[in-house]
Amino acid sequence: MKRILILTVVLLSGVYLASAQSTRYTAFEPASVWNDTDGNIINAHGGGVIFVKNKYYWFGEKRGRGASEGVNVYSSPDLLNWKFERLALATDTVNAQSDIARGCIMERPKVIYNDKTGQYVMWFHLELKGQGYKAARAGVAVSENVTGPFRFINSFRPNGHMSRDMTLFKDDNGDAYHIYSSRENYDLRISKLSDDYLFPTSKDTLLFSNHREAPAIFKHKKNYYLITSGCTGWDPNKASLHIADNLFGPWKNLGDPMIGPNSELTFGGQSTYVLPVQGKKGAFIFMADKWNPRNLIDSRYIWLPVSVNDGKVEIRWRERWDLKAMKDSK
């Protein structure tokens, strides 16, 4: 009887695991649990996506129980079903003097490819171990492979400025830019990066000073669009959209692009990235995090289509949607 019972349990467990591993998503369900192809919850918060050789790669914060554990990377051919690749950048568990020693805070990682050096370059917001949010630094790491492992290079305050929430943007001509919150989050700044993308240049300017963070930028035709959030800690707030025909400004405030229930609180989320969809003209996905400060691993993801029509941007709430619903922007 025991053998039969054990065999039954093993068989049932195998069926359950196979079911979890074979789950395939056919649509986006914003703010719902989102598992990877192994059946584990996706752990890639505050992240961004890069497209390489017919695959998307999603980099994001690996969150432990109250601690940063580095940067995870996942891959997908369809933006729905994500395979865990590896821990792309780990905290340093050997050298306690390292800027990324275990216990540090690593947030909002973004990766871009440098065509001149052949390296993938990662920037992230870094806070040093034991200092809370006082350090306000930018961290940089590189890899020859998109999935890593990434080698930590350095951390610093760009041109002497505090650097917290941030994103990277690579323009059509290959120039790259670092957009970051500064001066205790009162300022939002932009700096052009060096040719190797490893350092900021002296071309660094203030975009605006109205307490904005969580920058997410995209380009459509000749205009740049910048989505930001207010500064209310882990709590959601109202988004704003700015437009400019030059990255260094001037930027014009177009108001809140969110439409639908709870839109005044960005549907309960906070912006992190705007993803260009390959194969669709002017199609973008707005990426946001719905933070759960009591258990950051369980923070959810809100991905929604971005509509751009004659310069007007709308991000409308949808309970469920797929890429077929996306139309080319005008």
Residue ranges and their predicted role:
Residues 1-22:
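Bacterial Sec-dependent N-terminal signal peptides
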Residues 20-330:
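Carbohydrate-active catalytic/glycan-binding domains of CAZyme proteins
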